[in-house]
Amino acid sequence: MILSTAYFPPVEYFAILARYSVVYLEAHENYVKQSYRNRCRILTANGVEDLRFPIVHDGAKLITEVKVDYKTPWVRQTEYAIDSAYYSSPFFEYYRDSLFAILDSHPETLWELNGRITAYFLAKTGLSTEIRSTSAFGVPATAGSCPGVASASLHPSQADAWAPPVYETTGGHGPAVDTPSRGVPDNLREAIHPKREPVMKNAEYWQVFRERFGFVPNLSVMDLLFNEGPESICYLR
């Protein structure tokens, strides 16, 4: 499976990670605006809110070279927004300080920031998925060496030529069975996108503002972890 890097990735991203022993992040793509590469979604008292971070516009296009812009106080604003949204969630206090420490450390690049955040949530949800990067565009670094993980290449011109498989999260009732259509490459880097329908059908879980807005699917994985804590792994699998 090949995915793009993502900032506080959505729940569907982690539900996909839970189904593979190894997942490759595309290290040879260009930065794409208005994507999960530098934005995430949380649920606040006012509804769904997008959190973004700015990048340095220095001509760098390769995703691993894009630098984070810390000239504005976006870290403080992000932490305030997360505090306000989740201070009353059951498990927020257990994760707050260690999570904010990542933001406060000011990783230089988008790739590093997202990588550290993804590694954090893998550890806290208990997933053992190994994350690797591609060696060329659409090419896993060690193609064929991971049993059960397909190694597929997808050229940019093919990105919209197929319908992504639909999976279901099971909410703790064991692994779902996924049956991708024949010929569908295991590459969802463009399918998981804020402006596209989710490739996952999320089971419901408790959310802080559920009585006000109903259940809101596919928020950042932080929403799941802060509300479900150690049980998050059961939901994802």
Regions found by a protein language model. Give the residues of each.
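Residues lining hydrophobic/aromatic ligand-binding pockets adjacent to catalytic sites
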Residues: 1-237
